[in-house]
């Protein structure tokens, strides 16, 4: 990604629609490489013994500070990125890419976002190798999984082009 992007206000609803399958049992994640987006989801996965290769968090839940997730990440390599609400900053995109590269070399990595991590679901779908699973939280619904494949990437890229403008 070459530019910082801003979410178009009239596309916010479309971007927040469920993009995968609601997780009824964490067993579906067995033997999968996981990239998690969100503090609660990451904490739930770690608490159940499923360690995401990459975790993207902002140390908040429902916009309230909650630093407890950080205590689960003691053996993760930590990267920090700025990503204000309603944006997709190039810096954050590149940190997600770096975290994936680190994980492919055998070390788990976390991106701690100064701002908001929600929209980093886009690089979490577009950047990992096929076969990974991106897991995120859908408020009022639960955890959602997106299998990373060509179709998921194309849908994410199309929505990215439709819903964002360079800033």
UniProtKB/Swiss-Prot annotation:
Enzyme class of the recorded protein, top EC level: transferase
Q: Keyword Nucleotide-binding on this protein?
A: yes
Example GO biological process? coenzyme A biosynthetic process
Catalytic activity field: 3'-dephospho-CoA + GTP = GDP + CoA + H(+)
Task: Cite the entry's keywords alphabetically.
Answer: Coenzyme A biosynthesis, GTP-binding, Kinase, Nucleotide-binding, Transferase
What Pfam families does the record point to?
A: DUF359
Q: Could you tell me which InterPro entries the record lists for this protein?
A: GTP-dep_dephospho-CoA_kin
Q: Does the keyword Transferase apply?
A: yes
Q: Where does GTP bind?
A: 39, 41, 58, 60, 117
Q: Name one GO molecular function term.
A: kinase activity
What highest taxon heads this organism's lineage? Answer: Archaea
The enzyme's E.C. designation: 2.7.1.237
Pathway-wise, it operates in: Cofactor biosynthesis; coenzyme A biosynthesis
Role this protein plays? Catalyzes the GTP-dependent phosphorylation of the 3'-hydroxyl group of dephosphocoenzyme A to form coenzyme A (CoA).
Which family does the record claim for this protein?
A: Belongs to the GTP-dependent DPCK family.
What is the protein's name according to its record?
GTP-dependent dephospho-CoA kinase
Q: From which organism does this entry originate?
A: Korarchaeum cryptofilum (strain OPF8)
């Amino acid at each position: 990604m070459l530019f910082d992007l801003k979410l178009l206000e009239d596309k916010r609803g479309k971007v927040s629609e469920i993009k995968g399958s609601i997780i009824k049992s964490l067993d579906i994640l067995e033997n999968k490489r996981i990239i998690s987006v969100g503090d609660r989801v990451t904490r739930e996965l770690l608490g159940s013994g499923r360690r995401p290769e990459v975790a993207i968090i902002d140390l908040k839940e429902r916009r309230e500070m909650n630093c407890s997730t950080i205590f689960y990440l003691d053996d993760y390599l930590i990267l920090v990125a700025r990503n204000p609400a309603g944006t997709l900053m190039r810096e954050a995109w590149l940190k997600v890419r770096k975290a994936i590269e680190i994980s492919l070399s055998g070390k788990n990595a976390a991106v701690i976002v100064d701002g908001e991590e929600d929209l980093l679901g886009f690089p979490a779908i577009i950047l990992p190798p096929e076969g990974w699973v991106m897991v995120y939280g859908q408020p009022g619904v639960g955890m959602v999984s997106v299998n990373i494949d060509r179709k998921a990437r194309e849908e994410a890229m199309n929505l990215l082009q439709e819903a964002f403008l360079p800033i």
